[in-house]
Amino acid sequence: LAKVRPDGSTVLAYDQKEIDKINPENMFESMGEKSNGFELPGWEPERMARIKELFEMYKDVDEEKLFNNLVYFLKAIQPVCEKYDIRMAIHPDDPAWPVFGLSRIITDKEHLLKLMKAVDAPFNGVTLCTGSLGSNPENDIPDIIRSLKGRIHFAHVRNLQYNGYRDFQE
């Protein structure tokens, strides 16, 4: 959460080599030591106290199960979204690859289009997050934008700098 740059400023950063040194149980403590007191939503101490239990609950949830559950959810809320003109905008997985063995399902153009086809309704759209999608340098973001044609309901523009394989900062 606070990688120190040569000029003394700090940036958000992700380095797979650092992630590979920890496990879900000690992740909170490890990241807390490096965050300068900052906290991300979902990283609250009361949630992190249950991390081992939560990982156990999701150990058998593969990409297919996760995707099917997402489609089920989006179809279930469709009537309410249409009634109240609510635009849902799914945020891509960040980073765009599995972490600690947890499946990722919204990582690239193929997966975004698959979801738009599975729930083909105006309320169902995308948050175009250039950081999440850009975490995989093979994602062609301009092509993704063209492919989504009107299904982008929100944009979250981030500026990534690559430092190496699965290592970036913003």
Which positions does each model-derived feature cover?
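Glycine/charge-rich catalytic "coupling/switch" loops of P-loop NTPases
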Residues: 130
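Active-site acidic/histidine proton-transfer and metal-coordination neighborhood
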Residues: 1-125
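Gly/Pro-rich active-site loop or hairpin
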Residues: 67, 99-113, 133-170
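Structural preference for beta-strand elements that scaffold enzyme active sites
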Residues: 85-89, 123-127, 151-156, 163
